[in-house]
UniProtKB/Swiss-Prot annotation:
Known catalytic reactions: glycyl-tRNA(Ala) + H2O = tRNA(Ala) + glycine + H(+); a D-aminoacyl-tRNA + H2O = a tRNA + a D-alpha-amino acid + H(+)
GO BP annotations listed: D-amino acid catabolic process
The encoding gene: dtd
Protein name per its UniProtKB record: D-aminoacyl-tRNA deacylase
UniProt main location, coarse: cytoplasm
Annotated EC: 3.1.1.96
Similarity section: Belongs to the DTD family.
GO cellular component: cytoplasm
Bilayer-spanning residue ranges: none
Domain notes: A Gly-cisPro motif from one monomer fits into the active site of the other monomer to allow specific chiral rejection of L-amino acids.
Gene Ontology molecular function: D-tyrosyl-tRNA(Tyr) deacylase activity; Gly-tRNA(Ala) deacylase activity; Ser(Gly)-tRNA(Ala) hydrolase activity; tRNA binding
Annotated source species: Thermotoga petrophila (strain ATCC BAA-488 / DSM 13995 / JCM 10881 / RKU-1)
Job of this protein: An aminoacyl-tRNA editing enzyme that deacylates mischarged D-aminoacyl-tRNAs. Also deacylates mischarged glycyl-tRNA(Ala), protecting cells against glycine mischarging by AlaRS. Acts via tRNA-based rather than protein-based catalysis; rejects L-amino acids rather than detecting D-amino acids in the active site. By recycling D-aminoacyl-tRNA to D-amino acids and free tRNA molecules, this enzyme counteracts the toxicity associated with the formation of D-aminoacyl-tRNA entities in vivo and helps enforce protein L-homochirality.
Lineage, uppermost ranks: Bacteria, Thermotogati, Thermotogota, Thermotogae, Thermotogales
Classification via SUPFAM superfamilies: DTD-like
Keywords (A to Z) from UniProt: Cytoplasm, Hydrolase, RNA-binding, tRNA-binding
């Protein structure tokens, strides 16, 4: 699984002119599921995201997690994180999971974050979404359960 994690002051997702998920201070997490991903990848990613210390402590040092600051998480599915642009000009998405598997692991990831006590909002799987955010920092982290980066 891959994720782009952004520290935000606020974020929201709009589908068909309706806000379907919104948070204040916390993390916006774009998540992509690969065709070979498993429950273990979900667990690794949920652990990493929930414990990622990218919020500043009283000394201004990045030392606190989203849970430490009582922040919120907005999770948005994004299969295009598996776009392969090494050849040609159009990305290939052959490494992305098929929709049924992608949805199941995406929903499991959200469930695992909630089990860790986090307040989680979501976008809508397979929908065309407009994502609005105020990136705080900016701080943007790339994660990959295959540890490719």
């Amino acid at each position: 699984m891959r994720a782009v994690v952004q520290r935000v002051s606020e974020a929201k997702v709009i589908v068909e002119e309706k806000t379907v998920g919104a948070i204040k201070r916390g993390l916006l997490v774009f998540v992509g599921v690969g065709k070979d991903d498993t429950e273990e990848d979900c667990e690794w990613l949920a652990d990493k995201v929930s414990g990622l210390r990218i919020f500043e402590d009283e000394d201004g040092k990045m030392n606190l997690s989203v849970k430490d600051i009582n922040g919120e998480v907005l999770v948005v599915s994004q299969f295009t994180l598996y776009g392969d642009c090494r050849r040609g000009k159009r990305p290939s998405f052959t490494e992305a999971a098929p929709p049924d598997k992608g949805k199941a692991l995406y929903e499991r990831f959200v469930e695992l974050l909630r089990e860790k006590g986090l307040k989680v909002e979501t976008g809508k799987f397979r929908a065309h979404m407009h994502v609005h955010l105020v990136n705080d920092g900016p701080v943007t982290i790339l994660l990959d359960s295959s540890k490719l980066f």
